[in-house]
Amino acid sequence: EKIISVNAGSSSLKFQLFEMDDESVITSGVIERIGLEDSIFTIKYQGEKSVTTQNIKDHKVAVQLLLDTLVEKGIVKDLNEIKGVGHRVVQGGAYFDSSVVIDEDVVNKIDELKSLAPLHNPAHLTGYYAFKEAIPNAGAVAVFDTAFHQTLEPRCYIYPIPYKYYTDYKVRKYGAHGTSHFYVSQRAIDLLG
């Protein structure tokens, strides 16, 4: 089985395709400058790196180009080999303290939180919909940057400003780069015992 991990940014799509039997990276790369005439598609596979420049008008086109390339290069024989898509999501607010399978409720909450990450959450949803359309049988999971920080005590995440800003407008510290913090903390445990 293969899983693809993606990070759909406002004008980019980063990806890694994993073979889950041994958790090895099969291919990785990035599509940059999406929406511009000189978009750049970089893919690394079997020790080689390919870089092409072309017009990639939106994330839907970027996702289709990526998936077509995976088949054309023989990286996958068929898109049905991809059993799941992991989507990095910047802002999960206080809703999510772990990764979740994406359903309609999750999509609605990611959309609701777009004001907290206006350059990121809308792009994540665009990427989600593009993959869902292209490989509808693959499961989809959202991995939230903010999830790692949800164990903070209220005294740590509430700003020293009038409390009504927290209750009325949800102004608080949500944390950032939690997936990296989680990895580093787990790695430290592994190394330090």
Where are each of the predicted segments found?
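Short glycine-rich, Thr/Ser-proximal phosphate-binding strand/loop in the N-terminal lobe
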Residues: 3, 12-56
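Residue-level signal for inorganic ion chemistry
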Residues: 7, 31, 85, 145
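Phosphate/pyrophosphate-binding loops at sites that engage ATP/ADP/AMP, CoA/4′-phosphopantetheine
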Residues: 69-83, 188-193
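Short glycine-aspartate micro-motif
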Residues: 3-5, 84-86, 141
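ATP-dependent carbohydrate kinase catalytic cores
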Residues: 125-129, 133-193
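A structured beta-alpha segment of the ubiquitous adenosine-cofactor-binding alpha/beta core
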Residues: 51-78
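Short beta-strand-loop/turn "lid" adjacent to the catalytic site in phosphate-handling enzymes
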Residues: 75-120, 148-156
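A glycine- and small-aliphatic-rich helix-loop capping segment at beta-alpha/alpha-beta transitions
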Residues: 18-23, 98-108, 155-165, 191
